[in-house]
Amino acid sequence: MAGRGTGPDFVEALARGLDVLRCFEAERPTMTMTEIAAAADLARPTARRLLLTLEELGYVRVAKNSFSLTPRVLQLGMAYVSSLGLWQIARPHLETLVRQTGESSSMAQLDGSDIVYVARVAVPKIIALRVEIGTRFPALLTSQGKVLLAALSPGDLAVTLAEPSRAGLPPFLPRDPQAIHDELRTVRARGWALANEELAPGIRSIAVPVRDGEGTVRAAMNVTVHAAETDVETLTTQYLPHLLRTASDVSAEWALWQSRPHAEVTLSHPVAI
């Protein structure tokens, strides 16, 4: 991961420190210094200095020669979410949508060839996937990802699809490029996307775009269901109208928030803290 910078202002030490933080995943929440050095492609002395610096700053902790992240790293991700205003705006709308459908609902944005969850309201159901704010999945395997990819220009789409996933999942079988473009063209035309057990067996979802004040697609909102409980027809005939209405409300409120960047915006719903 290290050594990718070429510009005169690129700070390699900062990039390496971020590489160290990105090494920690759900599958490996605790790692030794040797494991971190290998995962981040760093010399062990370099990894040691970075880890000790991060420990002093409060971003990692060490116990029995193993390192793990601390809750302080949440400040980095939540600063981004808060700066968008998306979570504060979307949460009450997602809660209403969940009450209407009885199913979990989330919002995600594109980061490379992955989606990253930026808002979520879940119902207490056992599902095969653990999803929370910050979770990454390959965009092509998700309804939200398809919506976001469909909104890209041909050039941006080609660059995005060429990027490797950083979701930490096993490689998925490659698809025919023409089939991908055909599906995304359909998504773009009809305004919604479906993922039918592509990410995981038994998981089905439908997603629609969330737009900013200029009409640009900036996020995608979905409803996720158990495939054994809810068929595609129910998703498209019963849940999709609620989803489209909710996304429209969030888009309108987000556009208002963006138009008044230095003002206090009165939301249409109280925001729970």
Where would I find each of the regions flagged by the language model?
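N-terminal helix-turn-helix
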Residues: 1-88, 248-256, 271-273
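Amphipathic alpha-helical effector-binding/dimerization core
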Residues: 66-164
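Short, solvent-exposed recognition segments
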Residues: 126-201, 266-273
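Juxtadomain coupling helices with adjacent low-complexity linkers
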Residues: 190, 218-273
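Short hydrophobic beta-strand micro-motif common in sensory/regulatory domains
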Residues: 204-208
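Sensor-regulatory modules in signal-transduction proteins
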Residues: 210-213
